[in-house]
Amino acid sequence: MNESITRRDILRTLAFGAAAGSVLQVIPAEAAEYVHQMVHKEKAAAPAGKYAPKYFSAPQYAALLFLCDTIIPKDEKSGGAVEAGAPEFIDLLTSENPEYQLKLGGGFFWLDAACTDRYGNVFMECTPEQKKEIMDLIAFRKNAKQDASLSQGVAFFAFLRNLTTDGFYTSKIGIADLQYMGNTALHEFPGCPPLPE
């Protein structure tokens, strides 16, 4: 990686590319790997090796952890989004991008307000059933067409789901989950299979 490029340059490039589309489609793997390395360095430098959020408040970060874990949970095959560092990846990108700050900060504000209106509690203080109910409402775009008051929540969740997926599948855990071995050379090209007669 070019040493003259700063951390801020990389994060801005990543955030801009992700805003235009999926990180996996737009952002070079080297740049996404750089963000994961920065997260690792932040954790290593922190007391007890715990990542300190750069942008999100403690309640927002707790909600981010919960949502990322719900979007890609840990299973018997591999760790989930939280173990892969997706929340930290998202926080680090958001700390450098005003558009992300507006979309995600506004989304968490909307989520707490919607839960307060429906259940009398902010999202993280809701029961598991209430959390599932509100997430089911914002997980599908069709719900925003049926109820316009959900449109901001649906847009927020779609954006967060994409970032979580990008953060997961650009991490070591996500790449291992895909069983991606990299570009490998064929020792011999077997040719096309014969056509059925």
Where are these predicted regions, by residue range?
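N-terminal secretory signal peptides and thylakoid transit peptides that target proteins
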Residues: 1-18
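Mature-region segments of soluble proteins
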Residues: 2-3, 48, 59-66, 77-78, ...
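Extracytoplasmic/periplasmic/luminal assembly and interaction segments
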Residues: 71
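Generic hydrophobic alpha-helical segments
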Residues: 17-18, 74, 167
